[in-house]
Amino acid sequence: MKISDLDTPVLMIDEAALDRNIARMKDLTSEAGVFYRPHAKTHKSVEIARRQIAAGAVGICCAKLGEAEVMAAGGIDNILITTAVVGESKVGRLIHARNSARIAVVADNADNIAMLGNVAQMSGQKLDVLVEVDIGQGRAGVPAAAEAAGLAKLIHDHGWLNFAGIQGYQGKIQM
C-alpha cells in the first residue's frame, strides 16, 4: 500500500523514531538522577504509555479524568491527573478508576481538598494529592508559598489523604 492510498486523516507513527525518543528521555533522566512521568496528552495512547513505562517512566500524567480512565482501563497502573478533579459527578468515576490504578490528583483550594477526602473515604483507599502552585504563568495553582504550605498541611492532616508533593506548570518551558 502506498501512503497516497490511505484514507485521511490517518495517524502514522515512525516506530523507530518513537523508540529513539523514548530511549533519549530515559537517558536524559537517568543521567540527571531523576524519575520522570511523561504526559499522555499528546499521544493519548495506552500502547505508547506502556512503552514509556517499560523504558523507565514511573507512570503517566493525564490532563483529565477521562484520559486517566482510558489509561487505567488499558492497564496503566500509576497515573497523575494534572488538573483538578472538580464536581460531584466525577466522584464515582474517580473511585471506579482507582479500583484498577494508583491515581494521584492535584488541588489548589480547600474545598477541592475536602471533596477529594470524601472520595478517598468512600473508596476506602487513601488518595495521593499534590498541591498545584502557580510558578508565574497565572494559569493555575496557588500563587503564594504560604498558601501552598497551608494546603499541604490540610492534606497532611486529613486522615484519607497523603500529601504527595507540589506540581507547577510552565508552558513556555517545553522539552
Predicted regions: what is each one?
Residues D5, A23, D27-S30, Q52, ...:
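Short, well-ordered helical secondary-structure segments
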Residues L6-T8, G33, S100-R102:
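Short, solvent-exposed beta-strand edge segments and adjacent coil->beta transition regions
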Residues I13-A16, A104:
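Short, surface-exposed alpha-helical recognition segments that flank or form part
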Residues A17-I48, C61-A63:
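N-terminal glycine-rich anion-binding loops that anchor highly charged ligand groups
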Residues H39-M175:
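Active-site-proximal beta-alpha core segment in soluble small-molecule metabolic enzymes
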